[in-house]
């Protein structure tokens, strides 16, 4: 029949055909169906799908034969089930039986109660079972190598797992500081605008501030002088006001830092020579002696009087710069020295001072609050500098 190409039979009668005359069946050439040397074509019994059109199989009875395929009868042969798998590796394997202890650990069979007690007398082994100083029989001395034995065990097992609670608490502090810093930054950025509003309100007492830069020719709608657009003629004045406000804020911070350093005694300013308006500029100016201990600031200033001898004047441990300014102002303005007794008397009357402060706060408090409210965000920063410096 030829080579089997595994192609479905489109006509449906090979090899179950009965057209014996066509194949000249005789005694020498028997019927093809009975020929033992015929080519077993496994797909010959399968009628090609759509060979004669969609869903049409012509009747082949009589002319093409009487087989089920020739008659147009399609029989479905059930597929043979797959052979049973003998591979047990796909599922969960049963736990194999444990071999005897004498085969897996032959050295364990050599231990007995005497050998165990003898080994237990070793201080390194005993330290693992009994605390230092403890004993089961009372005859064994305390272990001496407890720390080394435990350290050797820790070196094998690794470091302990870090405590997550400590890690969380360590991260919580920086996060809170970051949040507080961001909050203060947003508040500090509002200081220039608030001061600008206060500045412009001085020109419109009792009225609503309106930008004076707009005119009838401009197409700009009415707006506040603190929110001028770039095309407004008052925009340059708004920028100038805010620049001056930034300089004032910077100067205020520097003054506070200077006062703080002076209060801490970190400004070693030499005082004035008694009876003079200036400090000495001679060679003795450089002979300052360091302070006691490890401080980097000098403890005294050497001045050169008229007789040529050096005189050491101690530097105040606190408010050195303030005292220097007061001495300098007292020399320049002699009438300031007359205020010292009055100030000392006024400070000594503590009830009077407190009543005066209360009265001034009650009378000028609301207006002072409106003036000082923009500077409120700076107070936490000043407090932190005062505490940590």
From Swiss-Prot:
Keyword Lipoprotein in annotation: yes
PTM per Swiss-Prot/TrEMBL: Isoform M is N-terminally acetylated by host at a ratio of 90%, and N-glycosylated by host at the pre-S2 region. Myristoylated; this modification is essential for its interaction with the host protein SLC10A1/NTCP.
Glycosylation sites (chain numbering): 309
Region annotation (Disordered) ranges: 73-107
Region spans: Pre-S2: 109-163
Alphabetized Pfam families for the sequence: vMSA
Biotechnology: Systematic vaccination of individuals at risk of exposure to the virus has been the main method of controlling the morbidity and mortality associated with hepatitis B. The first hepatitis B vaccine was manufactured by the purification and inactivation of HBsAg obtained from the plasma of chronic hepatitis B virus carriers. The vaccine is now produced by recombinant DNA techniques and expression of the S isoform in yeast cells. The pre-S region do not seem to induce strong enough antigenic response.
Annotated lipid attachment (N-myristoyl glycine): 2
Purpose of the protein: The large envelope protein exists in two topological conformations, one which is termed 'external' or Le-HBsAg and the other 'internal' or Li-HBsAg. In its external conformation the protein attaches the virus to cell receptors and thereby initiating infection. This interaction determines the species specificity and liver tropism. This attachment induces virion internalization predominantly through caveolin-mediated endocytosis. The large envelope protein also assures fusion between virion membrane and endosomal membrane.
Protein name, per record: Large envelope protein
Gene name linked to the record: S
